[in-house]
Curated annotation (Swiss-Prot):
Alphabetized Pfam families for the sequence: UDPGT
Binding residue positions for UDP-alpha-D-glucose: 148, 335, 337, 352, 355-357, 360, 376-377
Entry EC number(s): 2.4.1.203
Entry protein name: Zeatin O-glucosyltransferase
Gene source species: Phaseolus lunatus (Lima bean)
Lineage: Eukaryota, Viridiplantae, Streptophyta, Embryophyta, Tracheophyta
Length: 459
């Protein structure tokens, strides 16, 4: 099944085929990248399962009419609810494994596109490399790997794989333990995908040299002569007040009435469920902090967000929402995160530190109270707090199996929102935001990096 699929004129010089990993943070980054490439007048084809194409387009607030979506059927997969006792989203693994069956339809699509264009450029998520493997067998197809993680995280991974060799005068900060970052059953899937990265023509990161310059340079050093592009940030730097169909979320009307930088936004991403007792502690801590807040409290995504029963509704302390009326909002549906972060009333973000969320917060000049849960998130938290110094720790990864008490939540919120320390973080975050925005202007380092990539694939 193909959505918005149009035939390609034979004189088309280059088309781009994007293969995202089927998790919300990955789907979203690929949609942002699609928007940037389409703006260069290059046709973009975006592939996925029927379920995940529907999910991606449903949650994306920007126009997608210029993107050619291809929604393919894959074998049925179980879609269990998230397990709050499991910090890693193991409940999503069946959907990941089902998406590996995209190889055959993607291969057929590649054959078709390669017969209609002079060059086809495949950009696949590093966790979907097996799906793109047939690109190596078609003479006018080039393959690039997109890493949906920070350069800090990935360069650290490579450095450790190489045995931590000395790299001049450069020193990594102390990394948090990898224990608990990835479930055992996911390691095999990841390892199998990484076997195919040797076939690629280069690597792409959603970052900027303004944010992670030294770590991008390390990736270039470690990459065996293959090109590395830091093409980010992918997300829009200016956000429309309404989405593409004219809707504005009610929480934005509430934000309009608040003082500048007075609201902390709390969201822990789309993949991991919190334990009931942890939710109680967060609620109590927020109430005791006396700070304005927007808290997104919804069940983590299932592998198929459209399947099965209604999502779980989390219980809050009795009378909580009545007591915090006027002080805070609890949002139980999908929230417009980028719009919230871009609003002048938002002054902080309590986050799980997924890279997509980190980048959105950094590009909007909002400091982060870190609460990592799995995967790359603990290292992203170190980047935010120790390297960029635009955040503070709420959940210490060294105490990852412990309940975060209400007093710790309260203290973290107060430190970020009402202390000199928090004000200094906000000032650093705004300076970094301004530097990023300048880098995207004509002549800026990020603008030139994108120009370099477009010229490379269009040659």
């Amino acid at each position: 099944m193909a959505l918005n699929d149009k035939s390609i004129p034979h004189e088309t010089k280059v088309v781009v085929l994007l293969i995202p990993f089927p998790a919300q943070g990955h789907l979203n980054q690929f949609l942002h990248l699609s928007r940037l490439i389409v703006a260069q007048n290059i046709p973009v084809h975006y592939v996925g399962t029927v379920t995940h194409i529907r999910q991606a387009t449903l949650r994306y607030n920007n126009p997608t009419s210029n993107i050619h979506f291809h929604a393919f059927q894959v074998p049925p997969f179980v879609s269990p609810p998230p397990n709050p006792e499991d910090d890693f989203p193991s409940h999503l693994i069946p959907s990941f494994e089902a998406s590996a069956h995209l190889r055959e339809p993607v291969g057929k699509l590649l054959q078709s596109l390669s017969s209609q264009a002079k060059r086809v450029v495949v950009i696949n998520d590093s966790l979907m490399a097996s799906v793109a493997q047939d690109a190596a067998n078609i003479s006018n197809v080039e393959n690039y790997t997109f890493h949906s993680f920070s350069a800090f995280n990935t360069s650290g991974d490579f450095w450790e794989e190489m045995g931590k060799p000395p790299v001049g005068d450069f020193h990594f900060p102390e990394f948090p333990s990898l224990e608990g970052c990835i479930a055992a059953q996911f390691k095999g899937f990841r390892t199998a995908q990484y076997e195919f990265r040797k076939f690629n023509n280069g690597d792409i990161y959603n970052t900027s040299r303004v944010i992670e310059g030294p770590y991008v340079e390390l990736l270039e050093l470690f990459n065996g002569g293959k090109k590395v592009w830091a093409l980010g940030p992918f997300n829009p730097l200016a956000v429309e007040k309404k989405d593409s169909i004219g809707f504005r979320h009610p929480c934005m009307e509430w934000l309009d009435k608040q003082e500048p930088s007075s609201v902390i936004y709390i969201s822990f991403g789309t993949t991991t469920a919190l334990r009931d007792e942890q939710i109680q502690q967060i609620a109590t801590g927020l109430e005791q902090s006396k700070q304005k807040f927007i808290w997104v409290l919804r069940e983590a995504d299932k592998g198929d967000i459209f399947a099965g029963s209604e999502a779980k509704r989390y219980e809050l302390p009795k009378g909580f929402e009545e007591r915090v009326e006027g002080m805070g909002l609890v949002v139980r549906d999908w929230a417009p995160q980028l719009e919230i972060l871009s609003h002048s009333s938002t002054g902080g973000f309590m986050s799980h530190c997924g890279w997509n969320s980190c980048l959105e917060s950094i590009t909007m000049g909002v400091p982060i109270a870190t609460w990592p849960m799995h995967s790359d998130q603990p290292r992203n938290a170190v980047l935010v707090t120790e390297v960029l110094k635009v955040g503070l720790v709420v959940k210490d990864w060294a105490q990852r199996n412990s309940l975060v008490s209400a007093s710790v939540v309260e203290n973290g919120v107060r430190r970020l929102m009402e202390t000199k320390e928090g004000d200094e973080m906000r000032q650093r975050a705004v300076r970094l935001k301004n530097a990023i925005h300048r880098s995207m202007d004509e002549g800026g380092v990020s603008h030139m990096e994108m120009g370099s990539f477009i010229a490379h694939i269009s040659k």
